[in-house]
Every structure is written in structure tokens, then in C-alpha cells.
């Protein structure tokens, strides 16, 4: 047997007992390998050690892949199972038995090969290493060769054989019905692509709540071993989750059901019949007892032809058609998981890949031939299809992550799912990046108000009235924060009956159904509504014109209801995404589908059929009487309007609950309330500082005359030339004695400027007894050295 060298560790290689080697189906070539677990080097712990987990958050294994030593990096998938995960089987009496296993720790991992640009891994470590590894274009399966619960034991690593059962490898969805039909805009115009991308940026992460059913043949195939079946289903779900993570969608397994006592529906080789039967069972039975978004049936039945899977297109979130069926067509269950992911893609609006689609890897999920290789990514076409599906509001169930009150399992802090008694859950302390959440306790940190949600910003609640979800279109309403919760309220719509599309329609549950839009959805761009004469055919009561079907008979429409029966259009494409016949006569064009349960060929409820009249169940009825929405908004207090459930909703910018306080005014009042006292304090402080400054300046002016002022004084007060004083005149002047000086310093007259000396002067007398004016004498005064200059008045 030719072997590939996948792990060269000579001292670990040893003969494996034949009794310990499991029989690997059709695996004629495999290499016995011993994965080596690499333990990370850790710094000395400075904090309280974390609780030890049975399965670590991150793992690394060393092995040689494709002749080169490689390190496999794995990260635990903590959210593989939904919090309300349950398992259902039937006892010998046919009674349903449902359990909620407390699976406290996960042994399912996803990852890649370190330093490889294109690689992926989906691995279970529950009992050794079991799963799938890809490296470039090479794909491998790995399985333990013994039942020992060891990872460093003998494993078989074998290549994905693309030649296995190639003759039976196709999906049953017919592409010919889709390439030019509703989804003909796979190659969308640039403007449309920009719109889709812009819309996706704002969308939250998608949650696909997944339910798997196995028929009685599968139960027998796995020797009626429920534990083994659970292990296989969880490995498949882990692989599917790995694929859809690339679309920012999380696939959470909410339940597994095994028909242990017999099949609950008729399963035949006709895949279409089996799909219809499973669809009805799901809507009438399963959905009433278990909440989920999509259900798939895995069957051991060999479907006719090359079909191994079938699903309804663009039906995710539909109560009856969000289903798919998959044949257990391979000995390797992960190949079956690839088909399960493929059929789920159809439910999400994806068509098969064709030549012009760009695939990041060798094979993508939506390739029509499902057996050639294991898919590892989605093509460019699939991504555009998926974005379009989300844009068309067909995916409402994907945006509702499980509510804590809906969770019945034991809460586990660190699984990144918000459960009862948890404020937040950001993963383990190593994984957590939320600064508001304490990862050890799943509680909000002290001093903070919130940790997540549209109404939480920087760990604080946003103010009431702040818009947390803008209106998407004219039939939508904006949602505002209430100031109490960190989460945005549920999506609300304008009251049913509000005019839309420039008066061509009326809103109904957030949509604006019009004949024009339905014709374009059916036949594509360039389609328009047929003449009213075509709609008169609905009064005939034939297969090509009717309002109801009763006991197989096509019932005619009344004249007033003719616009509410069969849909008639003109122009557009000749191909449709549904099986059936296209019938044209004159300018009238209609569609006769094989499956009438979807009602795509009939005028939709809520379509305008006259002034204040809408179609409801193929009858043209009075809108206000039907919707009961007349004057609803007048009953709302404050700045509120009525929504589609006749409840009062605050207008944009107005704070709940009374809608009387504007968010803008509220914010302004807060700003004013804070800034006004600060402004008053600032003004008071400024006045005090100014007065103190003025006083200090006045003192300096009084005590320290400036040189500039002295110069001005010398210029103004320079005496005129007078004749010299004669000695006899001097003798007549009154003698000046020190005792004659005044005891107090009077204020200088305002017209007298003071000269600043070079040294601190003593008190300067400015006036003497007597009123006779004495001219300034240049001759030094006897006291001039003591008192400086003397100014006489």
C-alpha cells in the first residue's frame, strides 16, 4: 500500500494491533499518524487561576500534512448547541420522549493550519481527533483507530476521494428555472451591489436555529445507538457552522429528533413528494412544539435519479417551506454535512454556482455536483444571492438571537450566549473583549449600566428618544431607546392602511404590496401590470382565472373582486423560479404553478383594489373595517403614532413612554443644566479676578508713577521763562520750616502728574499755607535733597 508521509516521529511509530484498528469504509489508503499536542508556554500566574475546563478553549497539534510539518490550530465552538437544545425519540409505545441533555462542555472545534492562507478544520476531540482538514486544494479526513479517549494515539489520516459515487451527486433544484427568473440579478448592477453592501454593514449577526430529523432507516443504520447518532449529528452541525461563519451567520443546533419507532411521514424515492410530506409535518407538528428556523430530514432512502438533496428556494423563516431533505449518500458523514449546508443555502436564496462565479477555494458550497470534493467556502454568486435574500425582508427570523427567558438549559457563563441571571456573556476571560462585562461572573462591571445592545454606548444607557433603528422605508417606523433597556425595541411598522408608493398601495405589516411590484417579482424588470380587461378573466372560474379553489373546483370571482384573483402581467422574462406553465394571450400573461400552496400566482393580500379598499383572501374589502385602524393615532398621547398592531409608538426624537419630551430638548436641558451653573461660576470668578487686578493696579498707580507720565508732566508743566528772583524778593518770601509741613498726605490734584523717581520717595507735600502762587525756582531748595521736588499751589 502506497502511503503518504504525514507525520515523521520515529520514536512514536509502533505497530498497531489489528484488533484495535477500526474498519474505515472504502478507505484503501490511509496513513497511521500520532498527532502531538503542543502545550502553550505560560507566564507565571499573577491572578486567580481560571477554573480548569475538560476541553480547553484553544488547542494546537503538530503533524505533517502533504509532506510538510504543520501546526493545526483549533478553537472551541462554544455556541454549537443552542441554550434550549433538546433531543427527541419515541419509545416502544410510540410516545414522544424529549430530553434536554446538560452538555456543559463542548468538545467540538474549528480552526486552520497555521501560516496557510487557504486552510480549514472542523474537528471533534470527544474521543481522539475526528473530523475534516483542508490545506489548499487537498482535503483530508482524520479518525482515531481505537476507541480509547486519547488524542495522542494512532489515527488514520486519509485523503478525500473525489471519485466515490460520482454517478449520484446532484441537487434536485432545477437551475433552468432560476437563472433568468426572480434571481436573474445575480450579476447585479454596481449601484445595487453598493446598496446591498451598505445594508449589510448595519445588519447584526444572523442566527440560524437548526433542527435535524433522522428517519427510522438512519436509526437502524447506526445500530440503534442514540449516543453514536448524537455524536455524528453534532460533528455535522459543527462543520456546517464552520461554513456559515464565513457569511457572518451562526448555525446553532436547537434539536435532534430520531424516529425510533417508525417514520412519521411517507418517505418515497420521489424527492419532491418526500419534501412536500416533510414540509407539511413540520408545519403541522414540529413547529408547534419546538421553535426553530429551519428543519432538515436525513434519510437512508435512495432518491430517484442522481438527486441526493432537495429544498425550497428562498423559504427560510417560512412556517411550511423552511425545510430540506438530504439522502445519507456517503460513508463519510461530513460529506453528507456538505449536502446539508448546500440545501440550507437554497433556503437562503442561493442558486447553483456556474462558470462565471468566483470561488475562493477549489469547490464551493453551492456547486451542483455535491460529491466531488468537500466544500470550504461560498462563491461570489452565493454571497450576492444571500445579501439579496436579506434585503428583501424574507429573513426576519435570522435576527432574533434566543431570549434568556426561552432558555431551559442550565446557564453556563462563558458560552457567549445570554442566559437567565446573566447581564452579559462575552466568552471566557481569554476571549472577552467587552470592557463593560466581567467575563468571570457574566455581570456588568461596577459603575457601568450596560454591556451590549443598540441602546448601550460606552457602557452607559442611551437617553430616551434616541433612535436605535432607523426606518427602512415608508412602511417602517423608527425605533427609539426608552432609557431603561440596552436593547432596541422590536421592529414596528406604520399602521396598516397607510398610503405608500405614491398612493399606488397601502402598507401592510411593513410592506407595500402593489400589482406592479408583484409582476416585477414574478417576471423581472420590464414587467408591468396587465390591462384591467385581463383581470375580467377571473370572473370566468377556470384554471386561468379564478378567486378560490373548493374541492378541486376553480370558483369565479365576483365582479368587485376581479382584481384580487389570479395575477395578470405584461412583458418581462419568460422564465420563472417555480415549476409550472406560463400562459400568454393577447397582452395577458399568467403563471400556472405545479405547487399552488405558495400562492405566487395570486394577487397578494393587502394589494390595493380601489380607494380605501384592499384584497384580503381574494376579496376586495373596505380597508378601514378590515384593519380597524381609522383614527388610531388620534388616540395616542403626545408625539406618538399608531403602529401595525394598533399600539402607540413614539415618533422619531420623542422619548417614551408618554412621547411628550423631545430627545433633543432633553439633551439640551441636560447641557443647559450643566453648563449654566458653570457659566455663572466662571463669570463670578472673572469679576472677582478683575476687581482684584484693578485694585492692585490702582495701588501701583498711587505708589509708583510711571516714567511716561512723568515725561508728559514735564512737558505740560514746564514753567515759562521768568526773570531771576532778586535777593530782596527772596527775603520777602515766607520761610519754609519742616514744622510747617502738613501732618497728613492729601490726595494730589487731578491736574498734577507725578514723576516716578529712581528710589522710593518719602511722602511729598503738595501744598503750603497761603494761596499766593510761587513760580517754580530752579535754584535748589534747602530741603530738596530730602523731599525731592515740591509742587506749590
Swiss-Prot record:
Active-site residues (renumbered): 343
PROSITE patterns registered for this protein in UniProt: ADAM_MEPRO, DISINTEGRIN_1, DISINTEGRIN_2, EGF_2, EGF_3, ZINC_PROTEASE
Transmembrane regions: 669-689
Domain Peptidase M12B: 206-402
GO molecular function: immunoglobulin receptor binding; metal ion binding; metalloendopeptidase activity
A Pfam family per the record: ADAM_CR
Membrane topology term: Single-pass type I membrane protein
Top-rank lineage group of the source organism: Eukaryota
Propeptide feature ranges: 21-195
Free-text cofactor note: Binds 1 zinc ion per subunit.
Tissue expression remark: Strong expression in thymic epithelial cells and developmentally related tissues including the trachea, thyroid, lung and stomach, but not in lymphocytes. Expressed at high levels also in epididymis. In contrast with human is not expressed in immature or mature lymphocyte populations of thymocytes, lymph node, spleen, and bone marrow.
Glycosylation sites recorded in the entry for this protein: 91, 272, 277, 531, 551, 605, 631
Domain Disintegrin: 410-496
One GO-annotated biological process of the protein: proteolysis
The protein's Enzyme Commission number: 3.4.24.-
Keywords, alphabetical: Disulfide bond, EGF-like domain, Glycoprotein, Hydrolase, Membrane, Metal-binding, Metalloprotease, Protease, Signal, Transmembrane, Transmembrane helix, Zinc, Zymogen
Modifications made to the protein after synthesis: Pro-domain removal and maturation may be, at least in part, autocatalytic.
Protein's UniProt keywords contain Zinc: yes
Stretch list, region Disordered: 699-759
Topological domain spans for side Extracellular: 196-668
Annotated S-S bridges: 317-397, 357-381, 359-364, 468-488, 632-642, 636-648, 650-659
Entry's localization field: Membrane
Role description: May play a role in organogenesis and organ-specific functions such as thymic T-cell development.
Domain remark text: The conserved cysteine present in the cysteine-switch motif binds the catalytic zinc ion, thus inhibiting the enzyme. The dissociation of the cysteine from the zinc ion upon the activation-peptide release activates the enzyme.
Protein name (database record): Disintegrin and metalloproteinase domain-containing protein 28
Organism: Mus musculus (Mouse)
Lineage of origin: Eukaryota, Metazoa, Chordata, Craniata, Vertebrata
